[in-house]
């Protein structure tokens, strides 16, 4: 299942790359005079539901966390859940010429959480899962302003579309799995991989140099990955000694929709 997600992400990433290349081509063909601008803003993302599963469910040394069986809900062993609402802050440096803009964009998601349930036990029994995450992404993005003659006018609102592609480094902390009598801990991990986004929004000029952007954005940050490492099972009543585990990696996909509110400030032209 995860392989299919990754294949789709790669295809979408290639589409985003083509869109960025198109934006660069438009910029190169636009008027010679352009403007350098700085962007700062914040936003909220709502990643879609996902599931942590083994990279190799048949692994024995190290041991697969979930294994290849079927859980009490009839699905493969996994931890299914979501990341909730994710805050993001961003900073960009861009060049605008004519209808095209080209931008180097960095976004930081300082703190968000996975909350879900495993399916080892029958539905309704305690088997909750939690972990905290953060990510930093860097992308090259292209935008096209759509205020061309012949298109519908929206008053002071200037619509735009864009896409970007780059890299992301995502970190997940220790995962805690709570069962009726035991608690299992899984080591965290970091992963650097492909990231891409597509966006559409409107801009409002607040002055000669300042523009407010409000945009929808779809962002694909690829996979979140726990690393191979030591975990353990603890009996909360102390009836047994903690059991150490040598665990193989697991992963889940991190992608979803969000909104962005930002200000662009023109620093100068050339």
Residue ranges and their predicted role:
Residues 1-35, 269-270:
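Cleavable N-terminal export/targeting peptides
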Residues 30-35, 147-158, 206-209, 268-270:
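Short loop/turn motifs that connect adjacent beta-strands in outer-membrane beta-barrel proteins
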Residues 33-48, 159-161:
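Transmembrane beta-strand segments of Gram-negative outer membrane beta-barrel proteins
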Residues 35, 84-90, 101, 135-139, ...:
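Transmembrane beta-barrel architecture of outer-membrane proteins
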Residues 35-37, 253-270:
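Outer-membrane beta-barrel "beta-signal"
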Residues 40-42, 89-97, 106, 140-146, ...:
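Residues on the lipid-exposed face of transmembrane beta-strands in outer-membrane beta-barrel proteins
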